[in-house]
Amino acid sequence: MTDKEESNHSSEVGAVRSLQETPTWALATVCFFFIAVSICLERLINLLSTRLKKNRKTSLLEAVEKLKSVLMVLGFMSLMLNVTEGEVSKICIPIKYANRMLPCRKTIKSHNDVSEDDDDDDGDNHDNSFFHQCSSKGKTSLISEEGLTQLSYFFFVLACMHILCNLAILLLGMAKMRKWNSWEKETQTVEYLAANDPNRFRITRDTTFARRHLSSWTETSFQLWIKCFFRQFYNSVAKVDYLTLRHGFIFAHVSSNNAFNFQNYIQRSLHEDFKTVVGISPLMWLTVVIFMLLDVSGWRVYFYMSFVPLIIVLVIGTKLEMIVAKMAVTIKENNSVIRGTPLVESNDTHFWFSNPRFLLSILHYTLFLNTFEMAFIVWITWQFGINSCYHDNQGIIITRLVLAVTVQFLSSYITLPLYAIVTQMGSSYKRAILEEQLANVLRHWQGMVRDKKKTIQTPDTDNNSNNNNGDIDSGESPVQTEVASEFRFSGRQSPILQEIQIQEKTER
């Protein structure tokens, strides 16, 4: 190899190549990989949606659709950053403004240092051209192409963290409710019915529910708040709480039917709440912009912000425990002697602003702040390393990470399940969930009717069928009787039941 060939060969080693200088096999391999991964992810999401639709998980299906919308917004932002990074880099601003409100002051370089770096690095000519365009005017670029690329990475990390945090919310919440299933099954046993005989008189203070929430050192409101604050960390929903709240809900909304599956209703209610917390509102995006604006060196905004989600989650958990405790106090004040199970009163006045959904809105905002906090920590560690100015104080970073994980666990495993059951003590209830259970009963009955009609082949059976139809005309159908006994909405007839009655008359 001649000296000239060696010189050309050495100049090609490590050189930055455009696509027209890239081997086609390399280009095709990279394209195939990203296309395959994208198609697999799209198929998995569609498969999940189909599965949820087949199992009639309406709330979770809507949550998946909302999550897809969030990912679409994040994808559009990343795409716009990549497409417009060249034009944005051409925007020049005075240097005096560029040196204000910096997140890391020690990384600022002088013009001479930058020029020397540019001379040593011939691979960044495209980015350097924008720098020289601005420097020739005595200005600097608003944000470099490298900065825009790093920002697009942040949106990618935020999307991944948003998915992981919401998945943790759903899985931990359902794990918390799994043990409630055994309590629900216990309500159908003879022992439970005997222990909660409606004809049995008991002193209110001697009931298990009252003994759990009432004591000598909870007579003042402050003492009760302190007790409820610590209670959320251990046994936040006791068995007696579940059974008492179940009895109050059934008495208020489902007549006196003890066969109602309250645990299944609460689980579907959690799915409804999950559908709410999975989204990202414009106010939340505005919060992201504000925190990026205030991320100035020495202000430690993110450190102080990391305590906000923890405080809010603890306050909401304490408030929910207080609602249950005040129900026990109300029962004691109204009745010294009760019959059967203590009856809690369903009323929106238990909640702030008489609005149970207000707590969920605050919790939704808090969960997003926590997700943003974890995404930011992962992003700065990935992009700038552990030796960057963001990690000057390792203790602060560790504290922020521990607080974020703690908030995620508390809100997912304790606060949201507690909210799902306590908010059923409001004046209203999620009628759509009850209607969905009712619809399942109707579908089961309709399937039985179709199977029975297929077996009718003789005139005798046809006559019997006509006689049965006559019975239906003169009264209620079997499904109407079953549904009416299963779901009696405090004397109000279900719209689905009314629709089925009209449909049956039309078919006949």
UniProtKB/Swiss-Prot annotation:
GO process annotations (BP): defense response
Extracellular side: 1-21, 90-153, 297-304, 379-401
Spans annotated as Calmodulin-binding: 436-457
Phosphoserine: modified positions: 494
Disulfide bonds: none
GO CC, any one term: membrane
Sequence intervals crossing the membrane: 22-42, 69-89, 154-174, 276-296, 305-325, 358-378, 402-422
Membrane-protein topology: Multi-pass membrane protein
Chief place where the protein resides: membrane
Residue numbers on the Cytoplasmic membrane side: 43-68, 175-275, 326-357, 423-508
Location of the region described as Disordered in the Swiss-Prot/TrEMBL record: 453-492
One Pfam family this sequence matches: Mlo
Location of this chain's protein in the cell: Membrane
Keyword terms of this UniProt record: Calmodulin-binding, Membrane, Pathogenesis-related protein, Phosphoprotein, Plant defense, Transmembrane, Transmembrane helix
One MF term in the entry's GO annotations: calmodulin binding
Domain notes: The C-terminus contains a calmodulin-binding domain, which binds calmodulin in a calcium-dependent fashion.
Family from the record: Belongs to the MLO family.
General function of this protein: May be involved in modulation of pathogen defense and leaf cell death. Activity seems to be regulated by Ca(2+)-dependent calmodulin binding and seems not to require heterotrimeric G proteins.
Protein's name according to its UniProt entry: MLO-like protein 3
